[in-house]
Amino acid sequence: MWSEYSLEVVDAVARNGSFSAAAQELHRVPSAVSYTVRQLEEWLAVPLFERRHRDVELTAAGAWFLKEGRSVVKKMQITRQQCQQIANGWRGQLAIAVDNIVRPERTRQMIVDFYRHFDDVELLVFQEVFNGVWDALSDGRVELAIGATRAIPVGGRYAFRDMGMLSWSCVVASHHPLALMDGPFSDDTLRNWPSLVREDTSRTLPKRITWLLDNQKRVVVPDWESSATCISAGLCIGMVPTHFAKPWLNEGKWVALELENPFPDSACCLTWQQNDMSPALTWLLEYLGDSETLNKEWLREPEETPATGD
């Protein structure tokens, strides 16, 4: 049976061209080197070296063995390292859920920063809507969720970090009929136009809808890009996160409506599986920061940088 040491011996003999030179490099006696090679040849049932009067040279089988053996040893070393990492809590993947209500640019930056720190761990990020976040967590598909509602629909052992409140804005395109009318608007007035809806991604838990009045038509969209297109086209009323609406409101393309029944802010949280920590998850929890940082970076509209004079 061959070992990492026997491969090292064969490699030394092949490079030096003799058993004695290889023995000198390995700090062994020539007979020990010769014995190791002979035992390996008997196990393989093929000669590894062509023995000449003054030197030795690898046979075709010997050259193949050396090439393949190096590859096997490299894999063995990687396997050994991974076993040690796993014993210390390392896992090759970290799966997280991100609620669609958070600022998308923050998710993108988090991914970049994660891979700068972990080049041997895959970060799997799943975009979920409403109860889809809790569904992914309760099913064990993810280990952490960002932007989950604090109205917890499932039982289980979860740790939490408050993210504060998310504010909503009811918006329409600046050319929409409601934009030309004075508020505050009643539900009876609003239900004459369709409501923008993001479909809940939950597989097993009850599905939720952000804002939909009785007998109101829906415009169902798959993502925020489609949401912006539909709102800008004047197809619907949109109840959207204020941080999402801000650029269009600032440019005058959308108008925020005043409602007789204002939509309340949503309480959000960061939550993760308790007693299932890994180095990557520990790092991510520290990276995400405290409650104030989470609210500022993930739920609020970006702060405008004041202009500076020369």
Curated annotation (Swiss-Prot):
One of its GO terms (biological process) is regulation of DNA-templated transcription. Disruption phenotype: The deletion of the gene leads to a substantially decreased growth rate in minimal medium with adenosine, inosine or guanosine as the nitrogen source. GO terms for molecular function: DNA-binding transcription factor activity; transcription cis-regulatory region binding. Keywords: Activator, Cytoplasm, DNA-binding, Transcription, Transcription regulation. Residues 19-38 bind DNA. It holds the Pfam family LysR_substrate. InterPro entries: LysR_subst-bd (IPR005119), Tscrpt_reg_HTH_LysR (IPR000847), WH-like_DNA-bd_sf (IPR036388), WH_DNA-bd_sf (IPR036390). Its main location: cytoplasm. It is found in: Cytoplasm. Residues 2-59 form the HTH lysR-type domain. Belongs to the LysR transcriptional regulatory family. Transcriptional regulator that activates the expression of punC, which encodes a purine nucleoside transporter. In the presence of adenine, it binds to a conserved 23-bp palindromic motif in the intergenic region between punR and punC. PANTHER family: HTH-TYPE TRANSCRIPTIONAL REGULATOR, LYSR FAMILY TRANSCRIPTIONAL REGULATOR. This is HTH-type transcriptional regulator PunR. It comes from Escherichia coli (strain K12).
